[in-house]
Each structure stands twice: as C-alpha cells, then as structure tokens.
C-alpha cells in the first residue's frame, strides 16, 4: 500500500507583535474589571500604532479601571520601553473610549430570576458557532505545528527578557513551522521560518555579517531547543529573517488591532474556527467561553482514548442558555468500535455547555492561578495551567462506555 504524504504549516507571533500588544492590553483591562466585579460585561478593543494606543468598547460593571496605567504596564512588560522603538510605554498617547454596554444585550444575557434552573437564567452573549479540537500529536494533545511555532517565539521572548545572550533582540517576532506527514503521522520538520526584530548592526559589522550572527544564534539557541532533534534532518530548511534587516517593527511597523490573530490563538489552522476572537471579552461571550469548553470536551475525549482526533462544534442563539447544536467528529479515528454519534450522546450528558455552567466549571469570572492577559500571547490552548486544559472527565467518559 502506498503511503500518503503531505505538508502542513502553522504560524505564531510573539507578545511584541502589534496585534498581540492589542490583545494583551484588552485582556489586561478585562482582568482589572473582573477582579473588582466578577459579573462585569466587557467587550474591549485596542488599536495601537506609532506612539498611540486607543482603547474602546462596551462595559457594564461596578469596577473602576485606570486605562492609562494598565496600557503602560502591559507595554512595559512586553518590552517597548525605548524611544527608538517609536512606541514607548512611557511616552505613547493612551486614549480611552469605553462606554456602557447596550441595554438590549443585557436584557437577554443577564439572569432571569423567574427561571427555576440557575444555569438556564444566563443566556449566550451572542449567536455563533465555536470549535474545539484535540489530537495525539503532542503530549498536550495539540497539533504539533502550532505548538512548535508558539514555543519558538515564546523562547525568543524569554531570551530577550533575560538579557544574557542575543542582546540585540527587540520585542516583535514571528515564527512558522512546516511539518511533513506520512500516513497522518508527523515524520519530520520540513521548514522553519523565524523573523525577529533586532537592533541596528554593531559598528564595524555589515548587514550581511550581522544577519549571519542572528541566523546562527536562532538556530542554536531557539530552534534546536524547541524542535525535537529527531524531526530535523539535512533537508530541513531554515528561513531566518529572510528579508534581511528587521529593525522597524511592533506598532511602529504595523498597526495592531485586538482579535486579528485568531488562528494563532487556537490550532494553527488544523481545526475549524467559528470566527469570533477571544481577547477583551468577558466569559458571558460564548465566542470565548464556549471555545474553551469545546477544547475541554475534545481534549477529554482524546485523553480518554476514545479517539486520536476530535473536533467539537457548539452553537448558540443570543439570550438562550442551551446550545442550539452540538457536533462531534473524530475523523475516522474513534476506537473501541465507537461511533461519533455514540460519543456525542454521552458527551452531551457529561459536559454542560450552558454559559453559566462553563463559567462556574472553569471559574472564568474569578481566575485563580492564571489571567486573561496570560492567554493573549502564545496560544489559549495546550498550556496546562489553564483550567479548560484539565482532563478530569476522562474516567467519567471511560465509565460511560464501560472502559474504566
């Protein structure tokens, strides 16, 4: 039998990428509101460009937030602290344009006391469909390409902040990983792309010489630390700063907006996406909370050994608590003779996907040991400190199919 062979690519961007600067500011604002008022309704969007930050959106809360202070703190933490970056935490303008949320939306979302079941009182914040996914490619049950891409830029940021080596690094960077699959299994890494912002070349060194130093450093200190050696071979291609000089970057190089990196935030294109961004949205917005819950369902199904891959879709109507539909697809990888229909039937009984049930299960209104800002760079999934990554439903799923 001939082997199937194909290539698949995913990308990531660092915390210093302009869109991620926006995401982190929006989520830091959300963190501040929720810490004061767990019932806050927040839809916060951020725009960043040369020397300027604009924070806007709709809020219903009893909390009081200092937008200037939050934005400057986040920008400082990321590393934009020098005037030469043309986007500096200490000198950039910060404009707040937050205002009250629509009463029409509040009416459908907030608790209806006449309904007996508390979880039926809180409706979905909007209509839409959300997806979750899990697979056996990595220990985190995430697709391999996006996991490696996330780790590359995360390690770059850690090296930059440590300040011991590669001291020329600036905050903005991107990564991309292409994997070769044989018979649906990761066989090797075919290509790695890393573009990182950097200081001007040192005196007495040409641009070509400096780029050669950067290339060597990134391969040795980043790629070889992230990508398993057995996946790299003589034919693996490394594209390091392929356009050459990358001094101008961050919000000075490109305008940043909240919610523009939804594939980076999720599965790197390995799974469908409902289209709704996460950052800046409180957990009553099912764009966020139901995507987290869908990942939780998919991951537990795979962790329970019911399938090697699992896609979960859930959809909602605004103001209605119970999902309009739930769909589970194991991509012909279901085990123990199970069908997708059988898995879905049990999953619907085990996982409550009403918005308030999701919020309570993961404590999304009172985060402990994690923050929304933390989710806003390097992916919302495949990171074990987030509660939706727990696999506490594995035994219950196994028992449902007499596999325990």
Curated annotation (Swiss-Prot):
Q: What is this protein called?
A: S-adenosylmethionine synthase
Question: Can you quote the record's cofactor note?
Answer: Binds 2 divalent ions per subunit. Binds 1 potassium ion per subunit.
Which cell locations does it reside in? Answer: Cytoplasm
Q: Give the EC number.
A: 2.5.1.6
Which gene name does the record give?
A: metK
**Lineage, top ranks:** Bacteria, Pseudomonadati, Chlorobiota, Chlorobiia, Chlorobiales
CDD domains attached to this UniProt entry:
S-AdoMet_synt (cd18079)
Q: Region Flexible loop: start and end of each range?
A: 101-111
Listed Pfam families: S-AdoMet_synt_C (PF02773), S-AdoMet_synt_M (PF02772), S-AdoMet_synt_N (PF00438)
Q: In which pathway does it act?
A: Amino-acid biosynthesis; S-adenosyl-L-methionine biosynthesis; S-adenosyl-L-methionine from L-methionine: step 1/1
């Amino acid at each position: 039998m001939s082997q199937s062979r194909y290539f698949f690519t995913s990308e990531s961007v660092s915390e210093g990428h302009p869109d991620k600067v926006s995401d982190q500011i929006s989520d830091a604002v959300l963190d501040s509101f929720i810490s004061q008022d767990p019932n806050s309704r927040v839809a916060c969007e951020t725009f960043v460009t040369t020397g300027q930050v604009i924070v806007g959106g709709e809020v219903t809360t009893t909390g009081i937030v200092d937008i200037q202070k939050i934005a400057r703190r986040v920008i400082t933490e990321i590393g934009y602290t020098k005037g030469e970056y043309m986007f500096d935490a200490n000198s950039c303008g910060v404009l707040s344009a937050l205002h009250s949320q629509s009463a029409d939306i509040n009416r459908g979302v907030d608790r209806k006391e006449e309904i007996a079941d508390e979880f039926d009182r809180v409706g979905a914040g909007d209509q839409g469909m959300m997806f979750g996914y899990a697979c056996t490619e990595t220990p985190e049950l995430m697709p391999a390409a996006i996991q490696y891409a996330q780790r590359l830029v995360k390690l770059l940021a850690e090296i930059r902040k440590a300040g011991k080596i590669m001291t020329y690094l600036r905050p903005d960077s991107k990564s991309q990983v292409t994997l070769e699959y044989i018979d649906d299994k990761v066989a090797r890494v075919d290509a790695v792309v890393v573009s990182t912002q950097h200081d001007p070349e040192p005196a007495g060194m040409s641009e070509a010489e400096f780029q050669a130093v950067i290339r060597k450093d990134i391969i040795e200190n980043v790629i070889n630390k992230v990508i398993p050696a057995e996946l790299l071979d003589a034919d693996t291609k490394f594209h390091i700063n392929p356009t050459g000089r990358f001094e101008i970057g961050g919000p000075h190089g490109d305008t940043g907006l909240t919610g523009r990196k939804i594939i980076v935030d999720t599965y790197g294109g390995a799974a469908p996406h409902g289209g709704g961004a996460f950052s800046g949205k409180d957990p009553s917005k099912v764009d966020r909370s139901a995507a987290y819950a869908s990942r939780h369902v998919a991951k537990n199904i795979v962790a329970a050994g019911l399938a090697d891959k699992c896609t979960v879709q859930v959809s909602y109507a605004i103001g209605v608590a119970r999902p309009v539909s739930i769909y589970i697809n194991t991509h012909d990888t279901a085990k123990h003779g199970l069908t997708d229909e059988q898995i879905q039937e049990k999953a619907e009984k085990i996982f409550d996907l009403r918005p308030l049930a999701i919020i309570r299960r993961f404590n999304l209104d009172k985060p402990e040991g994690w923050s929304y800002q933390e989710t806003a760079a390097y992916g919302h999934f495949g990171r074990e400190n987030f509660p939706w990554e727990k696999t506490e439903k594995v035994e219950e799923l196994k028992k449902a199919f007499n596999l325990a």
